[in-house]
UniProtKB/Swiss-Prot annotation:
<feature type="binding site">
    <location>
        <begin position="128"/>
        <end position="130"/>
    </location>
    <ligand>
        <name>ATP</name>
    </ligand>
</feature>
<keyword id="KW-0233">DNA recombination</keyword>
<keyword id="KW-0067">ATP-binding</keyword>
<protein>
    <recommendedName>
        <fullName>Holliday junction branch migration complex subunit RuvB</fullName>
        <ecNumber>3.6.4.-</ecNumber>
    </recommendedName>
</protein>
<feature type="region of interest" description="Head domain (RuvB-H)">
    <location>
        <begin position="255"/>
        <end position="335"/>
    </location>
</feature>
<dbReference type="Pfam" id="PF05491">
    <property type="entry name" value="RuvB_C"/>
</dbReference>
<dbReference type="GO" id="GO:0009378">
    <property type="term" value="F:four-way junction helicase activity"/>
</dbReference>
<feature type="binding site">
    <location>
        <position position="181"/>
    </location>
    <ligand>
        <name>ATP</name>
    </ligand>
</feature>
<dbReference type="Pfam" id="PF05496">
    <property type="entry name" value="RuvB_N"/>
</dbReference>
<comment type="subunit">
    <text>Homohexamer. Forms an RuvA(8)-RuvB(12)-Holliday junction (HJ) complex. HJ DNA is sandwiched between 2 RuvA tetramers; dsDNA enters through RuvA and exits via RuvB. An RuvB hexamer assembles on each DNA strand where it exits the tetramer. Each RuvB hexamer is contacted by two RuvA subunits (via domain III) on 2 adjacent RuvB subunits; this complex drives branch migration. In the full resolvosome a probable DNA-RuvA(4)-RuvB(12)-RuvC(2) complex forms which resolves the HJ.</text>
</comment>
<dbReference type="Pfam" id="PF17864">
    <property type="entry name" value="AAA_lid_4"/>
</dbReference>
<feature type="region of interest" description="Large ATPase domain (RuvB-L)">
    <location>
        <begin position="1"/>
        <end position="181"/>
    </location>
</feature>
<feature type="binding site">
    <location>
        <position position="62"/>
    </location>
    <ligand>
        <name>ATP</name>
    </ligand>
</feature>
<keyword id="KW-0547">Nucleotide-binding</keyword>
<dbReference type="GO" id="GO:0000400">
    <property type="term" value="F:four-way junction DNA binding"/>
</dbReference>
<dbReference type="InterPro" id="IPR041445">
    <property type="entry name" value="AAA_lid_4"/>
</dbReference>
<comment type="similarity">
    <text>Belongs to the RuvB family.</text>
</comment>
Length: 335
């Protein structure tokens, strides 16, 4: 069952996201330090008549890595080719993509941490020397064919920084860590998107949605679309605070942006009576895979102080006990 606050992209969301995607720096809200630095690097590259160095974006899903790649291509006046690492299974897949690029093009690879080691080996000379080394044949008769490539910019995006190999990471000239958004930034995103959706969201309503959006624009826009549906059925011309609160309650998203999955996770930590809980134990208790827990549930809870990771496992913080109105003591239990 899909969560309304799922940070991964849901099916059929691509077209909706594209329609609400900012096209330039003036429309892009948040990530101010990254925007400033990229603005300098883009302007410098344009003045020199060169392409950009390769760029790597780290961070949880839904923070705008793909959007930034499109804005960079727009600002550089370059074409962009978008793909994901799981789509590049064989050397021929990568060769087909690289040989179809033109001078100055941008290649965006999402989930780049999922590239196999053999594909990475082919990518290294392409990134460094703009050359493709293809081995034809096998055994003593094998030959290496070198194909010159146009100068291009590779933009990689990953949610798993630790899974990027050191040799690949070192070939990116720019590395940026995407931060969660604050309520003010999300409120602006929601307000602008509501105008595009032709159902204006009042400021207090936008803030109410923003507070429950887990610091993530993708979640904020999804909640906005669903709240808009409630307002539409109620024959409301605008999204008012009462309608927003009612809709969010019906959607099962509480004041902290938590749903049942988050609360189940936190209850497990609280019930451990202060003892660290291993990731495998949590995943088994929740009937979820470890990757979902680590990539989807934990980042927001960690960033906002609801848990700590130790060498022995996960531990609930004082803030988590307060969430359940429990005293912060090692032997506390939910039941």
């Amino acid at each position: 069952m899909e969560r309304i606050i799922e940070i991964e992209k849901m099916e059929l969301e691509e077209a909706e996201e594209v329609s609400l995607r900012p096209s330039g720096w003036d429309d892009y809200i948040g990530q101010e330090k990254i925007k400033r630095n990229l603005g300098v690097f883009i302007e410098a590259a344009k003045r020199r008549g060169e392409g950009l160095d390769h760029i790597l974006f780290f961070g949880p899903p839904g923070l705008g890595k793909t959007t930034l790649a499109h804005i960079i291509s727009h600002e550089m006046g370059a074409n962009i080719k978008v793909t994901t690492a799981p789509m590049i299974e064989k050397a021929g897949d990568l060769a087909a993509i690289l040989t179809n690029l033109s001078e100055g093009d941008i290649l965006f690879i999402d989930e780049i941490h999922r590239l196999s080691a053999s594909i990475e080996e082919i990518l290294y000379p392409a990134m460094e020397d703009f050359r493709l080394d293809i081995i034809i044949g096998s055994g003593p008769a094998a030959q290496t064919v070198k194909i010159d490539l146009p100068r291009f910019t590779l933009i990689g995006a990953t949610t798993r920084a630790g899974m990027i190999s050191k040799p690949l990471r070192e070939r990116f000239g720019m590395n940026f860590w995407m931060q969660f958004y604050n309520i003010e930034e999300l409120s602006q995103i929601i307000t602008l998107a509501s105008i595009k959706l032709k159902k204006r969201c009042l400021l207090e309503s936008a803030k109410e949605i923003a507070r429950r959006s887990r610091g993530t624009p993708r979640v904020a826009l999804r909640l906005l679309r669903r709240v808009r549906d409630f307002a539409e059925v109620a024959n409301e011309e605008e999204i008012k605070i009462e309608q927003a609160r009612y809709a969010l309650h019906e959607l099962g998203v509480n004041d902290h942006g938590f749903d049942d999955l988050d609360l189940r996770y936190l209850r497990i930590l609280v019930q451990s009576k202060g003892r660290p809980v291993g990731l495998g134990t949590i995943a088994a208790a929740m009937s979820e895979d470890e990757g979902t827990i680590e990539d989807v549930v934990e980042p927001y809870l960690l960033a906002h102080g609801y848990l700590e990771r130790t060498a022995r496992g996960r531990v609930a913080t004082r803030q988590t006990y307060e969430l359940f109105s429990l005293p912060f003591e090692p032997n506390a239990t939910l039941f």
